[in-house]
Amino acid sequence: MTPRHFLRDDDLSPAEQAEVLALAAELKKDPFSARPLEGPRGVAVLFDKNSTRTRFSFEVGIAQLGGHAVVVDARSTQLGRDETLEDTARVLSRYVEAIVWRTFEQHRLEAMAGAATVPVINALSDEFHPCQVLADLQAIAEHKGSLSGLRMCYLGDGANNMAHSLMLGGVTAGIHVTIAAPDGFTPAPEFVAAARRRAESTGATVTLTTDARTAARGVDVLVTDTWTSMGQEDDGLDRRTPFWPYQLNADLVSLADPEAIVLHCLPAHRGEEITDEVMDGPSSVVWDEAENRLHAQKALLTWLLERQA
């Protein structure tokens, strides 16, 4: 059987995304109600990038599903030398039930998935962060009810993985997504086009703007992320000056709907992309969002493994 992979947010159809989110809600209520890895069976969890939430949530989640996480710095394997991704994928597929990889280039994940005979999950790449957006959607649903028809505004670096995933995952759920970003930091055109194609089937919309205040006005959900993603620390670009108008502060929050919620995938650079007042304020659901990484990823793994059986 050809495995299902989760490499980008639109790998799930709207109905499939809804199934995963419903299961995530069930697992949050009863963490041990699904045990697809009973045995324990193994899951490879590979890291090319440092991690806190991704590592803890996957390790704990795999254990709660009855399995064993084999956590490895990918650079310490033959991947860090000269073994091909395809050969690594074929070998790991003989040992484990799924492969989770946090890496840089999306094409490496796609090469791994092309050769693997078990599900491959994108735990973060430079282009997408789909597991995080499942957790975001779960948090939004918990606080806002139905997702379809909500208005969400992302502020900041529109060219980063969160902006891309929020577009694709958001419109899949029927959410109207606005990306407010300065010139030179807008989403990749091919991902905007993909999001708009998906939006045609869900009634959602994708809007790009450089006007943060107009973008925030009346929305139900405000989202931001770091202005400097991992690997960009030494790229020589000024990532502060162009982003200051996009800082998620009390002034911008006041423009949103009075019941609007605030999300940040973390880690946060307090005082830069988000203020302490907003991060710790009544609109923030950041800690629910972070917790939901555990539940959403367990649901995703369970859903994928059920289709592998």
Swiss-Prot record:
Protein's cellular compartments: Cytoplasm
Enzyme class: transferase
Binding-site residues for L-ornithine, renumbered to this chain: N161, D225, S229, M230
Metabolic or biological pathway: Amino-acid biosynthesis; L-arginine biosynthesis; L-arginine from L-ornithine and carbamoyl phosphate: step 1/3
Annotated carbamoyl phosphate binding sites: S51, T52, R53, T54, Q78, R102, H129, P130, C131, Q132, C265, L266, R293
Reactions accelerated catalytically: carbamoyl phosphate + L-ornithine = L-citrulline + phosphate + H(+)
Keyword vocabulary terms for this entry: Amino-acid biosynthesis, Arginine biosynthesis, Cytoplasm, Transferase
Pfam families documented for this protein: OTCace, OTCace_N
GO molecular function: amino acid binding; ornithine carbamoyltransferase activity
GO CC terms in record: cytoplasm
A GO BP entry: arginine biosynthetic process via ornithine
EC number: 2.1.3.3
Family: Belongs to the aspartate/ornithine carbamoyltransferase superfamily. OTCase family.
Function field: Reversibly catalyzes the transfer of the carbamoyl group from carbamoyl phosphate (CP) to the N(epsilon) atom of ornithine (ORN) to produce L-citrulline.
Protein name stated in the entry: Ornithine carbamoyltransferase
Organism this protein belongs to: Mycobacterium avium (strain 104)
Gene assigned in the entry: argF
